[in-house]
Amino acid sequence: MTDFDLMNFPFHERLDSPVSENGEIKDGEPIPQNWLNENHVGKSILPLFVNPEDVINCNFSNARDSYEENKSPSMDQMNYARNTSYQESPGLQERPKNEKDKSPIGTDVHKKDVPNFIHSTPRENSSKHFTRANEQASAQPTDEHTSPDISIEDCNGAKIFLQNSLSKEDFRMLENVILGYQKKVIELGRDNLRQEERANSLQKELEAATKSNDKTLDNKKKIEEQTVLIENLTKDLSLNKEMLEKANDTIQTKHTALLSLTDSLRKAELFEIPIGILFFDLYDSEENSSKLDHILQEKYPNIKGFLCASQQEELSRISQRFKNAKAEAEDLRNELENKKIEIQTMREKNNTLIGTNKTLSKQNKILCDKFDKLTIDEKEILKGCNEEIKIKLERLNERLGSWEKSKEKYETSLKDKEKMLADAEKKTNTLSKELDNLRSRFGNLEGNTSERITIKNILQSRPDISAEECNFLMVEQIDSANLTTLQNTVKEIVLAVGIPYPKLRRKIPLLAIKLKYENIMLSNFAQRLHRQVYSQEMNLKKFTDQAYYDFMSTRRMDSIDHHLERCLDHLYDHILEKMVK
């Protein structure tokens, strides 16, 4: 057996022994020819090194001696004694008396030399009878004068000591197990007789096999590396799948929220104008500008602007935040696609490794069938391969540590991505709140559109006003004026006429009557009277310009020195003087 075979031992499987768990031999079932080679190697190797004749002749206890004296040798024992020459195995040896008082430290040091496949492999099912006997022996009180301890030698010559204070039932159970193995050894002896005739041909095959042994060792190394790599890749793949599913769910929710945000923003209107589409036109444009002025002026030439400058700056900031959020979402989507591509490549590598592993396992099976027949050379190869196996296991442990470090790096990177997603979610929430606030402010600024005064309403409510007069007065241009201009105009009117704002709409007709009728009639009367008295007209335009100049220089209505007042005073004094005379 080579180190290549040991690396492929099915240590985790249970030994399919013809001896049942209760110690009875299954005589009804035939023992296969290659039972030892196929099922026993690597699973429970300890009974191979137990000589049943030593166990029968060993003095375990007084009860055992009396039992052996009255018991006749069985057919299996006689067959085993006849075929002992074909089976080489170390037997049970009595522990020397001078080793009884040795400290347990020496025993522990001695056990360290035992190969790893004896001490560390899980063979709970196959060695159940030995462990059960040891547990019952440890529970019973010991006596100083009991029979000496028993030691078992492994393939390297190292001794493994067993407890000897066992009961009669435990020894019967042990005997049944040993007899079962005797039966297997007898069958193997018969096979060895048949195989002896083919020794010459097998010797030639052995020479060819030794030449290809180096290639087999290389293949074995590749299989070891690939199996460990496949296991690590499958674990990493499962973890990456779970993390990617979580990331996909979070990104999907963020994407749906972003789509709903873009849809609501696309449907946004201002003064019956689809202003939301303008944001997307600006985003799709090649110019690196964050202002909607040129796009708005191209589509709606009559519109000069919306709201004040501060609110426009606020809207531009909101659009910039929206662009940043969209860019971050696109980056996350691209990163997710890259992760999917990496997982696909890893999956393809895994499939290729599985295929190579299958082919190598087939080759391994063919070589194992040849090497199983060469039991003598197996022991020599086994001794030289123990150190190599230890070195390889250390290398595999180092690789496992590196894979764990890379796994931790992936986990930290995924946590960072989750934090970025949480920050993006917070940003989208703040943007949605700001958008709702802007919508509410837009609604308050727009007011009730059903009460808006249009040219149609003017023509219906004022028959004295025509459409040409409305065009001359540029009434429609008022609808395109911004809020600040309209507010300033109304304030100037209120301050100029001295009427409170709540009474302004009600007293506007009175102002119109005074301006269009009463003031004109009074000015005509004064002009006619002045012409009659002085034979010339008053220069009212000059008086008005002088009063306007005084107001603009002082910005005070009470400080205007209107020349019309002096002119009318002189006219009144002159008429009064004429009337008195």
UniProtKB/Swiss-Prot annotation:
Q: Name positions with the PTM Phosphoserine.
A: 17, 20, 72, 85, 89, 151
> Region labeled Disordered — which residues?
86-150
* Domain of life assignment: Eukaryota
Write out the biased-composition intervals (Basic and acidic residues). 94-114
Q: State any GO CC term.
A: outer plaque of mitotic spindle pole body
Q: Which InterPro entries match?
A: Sid4-like (IPR021750)
Q: Which Pfam families match?
A: SID (PF11778)
Question: What is a GO molecular function of this protein?
Answer: structural constituent of cytoskeleton
Q: Which GO terms describe its biological process?
A: cell division; meiotic cell cycle; mitotic spindle organization; regulation of microtubule nucleation; spindle pole body organization; sporulation resulting in formation of a cellular spore
Q: How is it modified after translation?
A: Phosphorylated in its N-terminal part.
Query: Coiled-coil ranges per the record?
Result: 179-252, 306-363, 373-451
Please state where this protein is localized.
Cytoplasm, Cytoskeleton, Microtubule organizing center, Spindle pole body
Provide this UniProt record's keywords sorted from A to Z.
Cell cycle, Cell division, Coiled coil, Cytoplasm, Cytoskeleton, Meiosis, Phosphoprotein, Sporulation
Q: How does it assemble?
A: Interacts directly with ADY3 and YOR129C. Interacts with ADY4. Probable component of a SPB complex composed of ADY3, SSP1, DON1, MPC54, SPO21/MPC70, NUD1 and CNM67.
The Swiss-Prot or TrEMBL note on domains reads: The length of the coiled coil are required to adjust the space between outer plaque and the central plaque.
* Function summary: Involved in the pathway that organizes the shaping and sizing of the prospore membrane (PSM) during sporulation. Required for the proper formation of the spindle pole body (SPB) outer plaque. May connect the outer plaque to the central plaque embedded in the nuclear envelope.
Protein name listed in UniProt = Chaotic nuclear migration protein 67
* Organism of derivation: Saccharomyces cerevisiae (strain ATCC 204508 / S288c)
Organismal lineage: Eukaryota, Fungi, Dikarya, Ascomycota, Saccharomycotina
